[in-house]
UniProtKB/Swiss-Prot annotation:
This is Putative uncharacterized transmembrane protein DDB_G0284827. The chain crosses the membrane at residues 10-27. It comes from the Eukaryota. GO terms for cellular component: membrane. It is found in: Membrane. It is a single-pass membrane protein. Its main location: membrane. Keywords: Membrane, Transmembrane, Transmembrane helix.
Length: 61
């Protein structure tokens, strides 16, 4: 019985380590999404530049 109990404890211990590593990996992915938002802000600045071009075209008309 003691060998089986120790085996169960090992399984729970490894599962706990795996679960904690999985939890730590989730916030890292969120940080990557924030970096993607920085690239989208650059694309938004390009969109504003295109809007300025459209305003110039309207003034030409």
């Amino acid at each position: 019985m003691t060998e089986k109990d120790s085996f169960k404890k090992r399984i729970l211990f490894f599962f706990f380590i795996f679960f904690t590593l999985f939890l730590f990996n989730i916030p890292k992915k969120k940080k990557k999404k924030i970096k993607k938002n920085k690239t989208t802000s650059k694309s938004n600045s390009n969109v504003y530049g295109e809007k300025k071009i459209f305003k110039k075209k309207k003034s030409d008309i």
